[in-house]
């Protein structure tokens, strides 16, 4: 529960509209719960459901690499609202990784499907993808955290 709220708070502090903040809070529900996009659309409207859908990974049967490559390519041309929610999600994720890294060191990489090198590839390319249409405050923060974690 803490992660979705943290994503919403990042968006709120960055000045995004209520609909974007709500989508940030709901961004993982379709993938991680029984509350699906049709439920979000019914309860919160088409706009919020579309933002959440844009932040969801494709078919989980695809390899980690294929899913991440899809995300990187999709976000290059996604709407500014989808890019903001995706960026806030990754920003909170990387800050959590940094916190764990500071406590556990390189052992932290054992918790992931792919190791440090692949995570660095993903986050570095994600930053470039998110800024493809132009930089914004959350992507600048994400880039700083990526450098902080991987350029130690």
Segments from the language model and where they lie:
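Active-site helical microenvironments for divalent-metal-assisted chemistry
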Residues: 1-152
């Amino acid at each position: 529960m803490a992660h979705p709220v943290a994503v919403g708070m990042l968006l709120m502090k960055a000045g995004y509209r209520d609909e974007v903040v709500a989508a940030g809070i709901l961004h993982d529900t379709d993938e991680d719960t029984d509350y699906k996009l049709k439920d979000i659309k019914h309860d919160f409207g088409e706009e919020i459901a579309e933002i959440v859908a844009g932040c969801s990974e494709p078919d989980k049967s695809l390899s980690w690499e294929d899913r991440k490559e899809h995300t990187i390519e999709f976000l290059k041309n996604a709407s500014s609202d989808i890019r903001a929610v995706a960026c806030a999600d990754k920003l909170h994720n990387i800050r959590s990784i940094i916190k764990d890294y500071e406590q556990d060191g390189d052992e932290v990489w054992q918790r992931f499907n792919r190791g440090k090198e692949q995570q660095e590839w993903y986050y570095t390319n994600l930053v470039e993808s998110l800024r493809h249409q132009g930089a914004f405050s959350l992507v600048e923060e994400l880039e700083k955290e990526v450098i902080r974690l991987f350029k130690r």
